[in-house]
Amino acid sequence: MAKYFGTNGIRGTLEDVGPAFALQAAQAIGAHFKCGRMLVARDHRLTGELLRNAVVAGLQSAGCEVIDLGITTSPTAEFMLGKMKADGLIIITASHNPPEYNGLKVVDGKGISVSKERGEEIEKLFGNVKLADFGSIKPVQGHGTSAREHMDAMKALLHPDRIAKRKPFIILDLGNGTTATIAPQLLKELGCKILTINSHMDGHFPGRPSEPLEQNIQELIRMVKETKADCGIAWDGDGDRIVFVDEKGNFVVGDKVCALSVLLKLKEKNGDVVTTVATSKAVEDVASKFGCKTIYTRVGAPYMSDVMANGKAVIGGEEVGGVIWPELSLAKDGIFTAAKIVEAICEKPLSAWLKEIPAYYNVKTRVECSEKRKKAVLDGVWDHATSKGGRVIRHGDDAIRIDQVDSWVIIRASGTEPCIRIFGEAKSKDKAEALVKEYEKLARSLA
Ligand code: MG
């Protein structure tokens, strides 16, 4: 079992992911990528600069050529990885976690982020890396035009004329995150009228918690209603996750953003759709309407991008509002998802688009649980579920999904936080709530 790598890289507070640790980890990562050409990017967290310095020192001392992209969104960094054909990328980010967290997200040259399993291989190199000779240390190169290059690539995939003609009014809640480096500029250039809130990057996240949950974006919801905006958009801290508020002020959950993205993509081009076992069945229903296949993976971006790299998928997405557009990268790109949906609402309102998505009720909750107790909770859930009958499947070592007619529930040990996540879905709200309550109670008693 990997000690430090979770479902999406390494995360922790400065105590666990400090400069000495980051230096050692970066040396091991550099060696894993054969000491080649490595990109480094970071978000704007308070510990970002010190970890960046340690990561760069680690890579350089392992003999890598380092290109520093500076502060960018994760999707921008992952787009640049493909564009610059580098051997690997380290993004210093803790995504949507609280301010005191930071982490290392590691992506290989194919654009696939390093999973727990592959992380275990890297961990074996910790402390065992042969340092480069004095004469072969390479200077660090800066690269300051990533946002511009990412924007140009996105614009080439859109129809800016349609947006410029309609001039939609959009409110952006940047959550004091890195989307400030790109999202307002892109939407302005596309011809939108925009209003931004929480728009300065601030590692204290003074405006709202970084995770774009409904309870965290109440200000955006209120402003969309008051100003009669065409929609509101909110991202997490590093810009891979996105949620919407429709023109009536309704929160649009990540599953629906994902299903709508699939609908928009398949209208243009048919192909396989990749999603995780924790995503709403609405995605599969949309794909079936177009006669397209849905491929399910374990929860975690690495598993989705792995399938996408080796198959014929035209789009991928997961329930938190992360959508992969393979023409740009194999990473979740919340910036392009924003632009794509903004383009669609120039044709008809967001609420009208959402009527085309099959209605399911989703209930999501979490139960606090230490790392030590996660296995015991999952074992208990397994015993309970299998004794009741129905289709019960384990997905990897961290999730159990129980399928009944027209409803399902997944119980999953979080790979990034000390908690168990429980998501349920059904055709009726009562049924979804009852299903989630049953497993929430059980998990609580076992945690
Ligand atoms: Mg994120």
Which residue stretches match the model-derived regions?
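Proline/glycine-rich low-complexity loops and linkers
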Residues: 120-156, 247-319, 324
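Glycine-rich phosphate-binding loop
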Residues: 86-101, 224-246, 251, 294-333
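N-terminal small/polar loop signature for handling phosphorylated ligands or for N-terminal nucleophile
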Residues: 31, 38-102, 185-245
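Gly/Ser/Thr-enriched, mixed-charge loops and adjacent short helices
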Residues: 13, 102-227
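Phosphate-binding and adjacent anionic-ligand microenvironments
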Residues: 269-447
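An N-terminal, well-structured beta->alpha segment
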Residues: 1-63, 68, 87, 137-170
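Short glycine-centered, acidic/aromatic-flanked micro-motifs in structured strand/loop junctions
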Residues: 41-43, 172-174, 246, 327, ...
